[in-house]
Amino acid sequence: MASKKGNRIVIKLKSTESGHTYTTEKNRRNDPSRLELRKYDPIVRRHVLYRETK
């Protein structure tokens, strides 16, 4: 039986400097555009910009 498509989806956040990725969830209704967050990148050992990828 197919379930109803929910508002929350799993996305990948990719570092703009090293290529490191985080996975997180976002709400389709509240955040329809691509997400950009500053998070810690363990490869370059500092906070950098992470952008949502498909």
From Swiss-Prot:
GO molecular function, one term: structural constituent of ribosome
Pfam family, one: Ribosomal_L33
GO CC terms: cytosolic large ribosomal subunit
SUPFAM superfamilies in UniProt: Zn-binding ribosomal proteins
One of the GO biological process terms: translation
Keyword Transcription regulation: no
InterPro entries: Ribosomal_bL33, Ribosomal_bL33_CS, Ribosomal_bL33_sf, Ribosomal_zn-bd
Membrane-spanning intervals of the chain: none
Keyword annotations from UniProtKB, A to Z: Ribonucleoprotein, Ribosomal protein
Top-level taxon of the source organism: Bacteria
Family that this chain belongs to: Belongs to the bacterial ribosomal protein bL33 family.
Identification of the protein by name: Large ribosomal subunit protein bL33
Encoding gene per record: rpmG
